[in-house]
Structures are given as structure tokens and as C-alpha cells.
A protein has these predicted regions:
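Short beta-strand segments enriched in small/hydrophobic residues
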Residues: 19, 24-29, 64-78, 188-205
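Short catalytic-loop micro-motif centered on adjacent basic/acidic residues
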Residues: 102-104, 127-130, 263, 310
Length: 367
């Protein structure tokens, strides 16, 4: 007697053929909707398949047809609503075009991304959409590109690979947001990110994420344009969990040379930063100004509402899926999609509370 709960054997084409009293080849043609088969045979095969709860072997089908009608999506942190919105845009678009989506989360780990890409290719996905965990170590992605497998990047680039990429100009919007804070009198502006590095940030160090590198570069450009020194000591990376985010926030907001404004690189960091500010008994914008990347519903419900950098993330997901489907179906490439992030000015940014009377005014510097 089989043990209770033992796994039931999958129903095969041979089982369906036997039940329908036809050959295996006839059953395969009827189930796959290809080749010549009589209407009587087709009806018997489909009835037998339904009675046996037959499910097609998608891997075998893809080996026969060369297509699985499946898209692989690899993102860094599905807990982050940023990627949730992007993925929704991808899946909505893929579904309309008749494609399924397999989603893999990497926790922004390159080794996990390498494994994810390998697994998805083993499952014979028709194409890949990837938010690269590293813009430097991209050998696995270059291999996919060289193989001719359709590939699209979302949110970040991967070095100088000639791959369609759906992302905003991070340096531009970071420069604009930093200039907004500088115009309000802030000079000590902290930037907090989850990006993992082996050492504290210093100018010129290689950063694995093009997105974070561009944001820091945009901040640096705004300071340079204003004739000011960029406070490298306030670029804080490795904020990988709630405790480290709170600890970093407390560090940058204490002492005589503390930060007077904080920029959070994503919504998850922002939640912990806001909590840490409240725990310190500070308020914004009176004690400290605050700005974050991405615009989520909760940012409008705080008091005051938070100033944010809004990105068209859902539309980026839609565009990524459309671009990949065009590649998979051999259609001509469209003009490169352009996406613009927007600085949404609400109530969490105000004048610098500690600006001294003898501190120099901003000066525009020609570059």
C-alpha cells in the first residue's frame, strides 16, 4: 500500500492516448494543436485529457517548439515597493501578450543573480529582464547577450553593455534635488544607501551599482556647481537592515557638525530613517530636512508629507516587457524609451536650522 500523501504520478501523453484509444503520436498532435488529426480523434483526446487532469510538460513543449512563452525577471529586492511596481508593469504587459513570468529575487547579491540567470535559462525562458546587482561584474549577463537570448535591463545599467535599458537619468535628478537642498541653506547633506561595500565611501571608489554611483555623482556635481566642498563623510553605505539604518541616522544627526538634511535612497530605508529621527526627538523640517527616492502612498500621509523623487517605475516595467517581447518576436526595435524622474516638493524640506551668519552664500560656478 502506498503511504498516505504519496506524490501522484504525473499524467503523460501516453496515458491520455491509452484512455482515448489512439496512438501516442495522434494524442500529441491533438494536445499540441499541430499536424493532421481527425475531429473525432481530437475530441476523444481532449475529453481523456480533461478526465485525467492532464497538464502539458512545458519544458518538453519548449524543446519541440523552441518557445516557452515565458519571461524570466530578476530583481534585487522584491520587498521594496519600487521593484513591486516595476514587476507589476512587466506582468501586466506580458499577460496581455500571452506570456507568463517567472520572478526571482536576488537580495542584491551577484552570486544569487548568477544562479538565478542560470536557473531561468535552464527553464528555457524566451527572454530575460534583469535589474543588475552589479554594474561591474557582468560576465554572466554578457554571456547571455552574446548567446543572442533576448535581454533587457531595468532600473540600472551593466557597464557599457549595448542592451536596451529602462531607467531614469539618476545623475540629473540627484543634482536637481541636491541643489534644492543647497538653495535652502543646507551644506551638510547625508545620503544613506543599502549598497554593500568593503570600506566606507571615498571619492573615486568603484561602486557596484550604476544607480547609486550616479546619485552620488549628481550630488557631487551640485556641490561643485555651487562652489562648495562635497561632504564625503556623510555618504553612508551598507545600510542593510533596520538596525544599521537607525544607527547610521543617529550618527549623522549628532554632534556639532551634524547633517541638517538626509536623503534616503529608497522607501524601505526611508521608513527606518523617519523612525530614527522621531526617536531622537527631532522633527522635519524644523530640525532636519528629509528627502527620499520614490513616491509611495504613505509618503503623503505623514505630517508633514514627505518630499520625494518620483520615478515612473510602473511605466518602466511596461516598457521593459514591450522591448523584450519585440526582441523575442523578431520585430523591429523602437526608439529608445525616455524616462524622467520628478522632484515632488512637499513639507519635509525647509531652511537649514543651523546656518551660521558668516557662512558663505552660494555662488554659481561655470563648468
Amino acid at each position: 500500500m502506498k503511504a498516505e500523501g504519496a506524490r501522484r504520478r504525473d499524467v503523460t501523453v501516453a496515458d491520455v492516448a491509452k484512455a482515448a484509444q489512439v496512438s501516442k503520436a495522434q494524442a500529441a498532435r491533438a494536445l499540441g494543436n499541430y499536424g493532421a488529426v481527425s475531429e473525432d480523434v481530437r475530441e476523444r483526446v481532449l475529453a481523456a485529457a480533461e478526465a485525467l487532469a492532464y497538464r502539458p510538460n512545458e519544458l518538453a513543449r519548449s524543446m519541440n517548439t523552441g518557445k516557452s512563452h515565458t519571461i524570466g525577471v530578476v530583481v534585487g529586492d522584491i520587498e521594496n515597493p519600487h521593484f513591486g511596481l516595476a514587476t507589476r508593469g512587466i506582468t501586466d504587459t506580458a499577460k496581455k501578450a500571452g506570456y507568463n513570468v517567472i520572478l526571482v529575487n536576488t537580495d542584491e547579491d551577484r552570486a544569487a543573480e548568477v544562479d538565478a540567470v542560470r536557473v531561468l535559462l535552464d527553464k528555457r525562458v524566451d527572454g530575460l529582464i534583469v535589474a543588475p546587482a552589479s554594474s561591474v561584474d557582468t560576465g554572466h549577463l554578457q554571456e547571455v547577450h552574446r548567446s543572442g537570448r533576448p535581454l533587457v535591463f531595468i532600473d540600472r545599467t551593466a557597464g557599457d553593455m549595448p542592451v536596451e535599458t529602462m531607467a531614469v537619468d539618476m545623475a540629473r535628478i540627484s543634482r536637481e534635488a541636491t541643489q534644492y537642498l543647497l538653495d535652502a541653506g543646507h551644506r551638510r547633506i547625508a545620503f544613506i544607501s543599502t549598497l554593500t561595500t568593503d570600506a566606507p565611501y571615498t571619492a573615486g571608489m568603484a561602486l557596484g551599482s550604476s544607480q547609486i554611483a550616479d546619485r552620488i555623482e549628481g550630488m557631487r556635481e551640485a556641490y561643485l556647481d555651487s562652489g562648495l566642498d562635497f561632504p564625503e563623510d556623510l555618504v553612508r553605505l551598507n545600510a542593510g537592515d533596520e538596525d544599521s539604518i537607525r544607527s547610521i541616522t543617529r550618527e549623522v544627526l549628532r554632534g556639532p557638525d551634524r547633517a541638517t538634511a538626509v536623503v534616503a535612497s529608497d522607501g524601505l530605508i526611508a521608513l527606518s530613517v523617519v523612525e530614527a529621527i522621531q526617536e531622537l526627538g527631532l522633527s522635519f523640517p524644523g530640525d532636519v530636512s528629509f528627502l527620499m527616492y520614490d513616491d509611495f502612498a504613505w509618503t503623503r500621509l505623514t505630517s508633514p508629507p514627505l518630499t520625494v523623487i518620483a520615478q515612473p517605475v510602473y511605466n518602466m516595467g511596461v516598457a521593459a516587457a514591450k522591448a523584450l517581447i519585440r526582441q523575442m518576436e523578431g520585430l523591429p526595435s523602437a526608439a529608445p524609451a525616455q524616462f524622467t524622474a520628478t522632484l515632488v516638493r512637499r513639507g519635509s524640506v525647509g531652511p537649514c536650522p543651523e546656518r551660521s551668519a558668516n557662512e558663505p552664500e552660494l555662488e554659481a560656478v561655470d563648468r
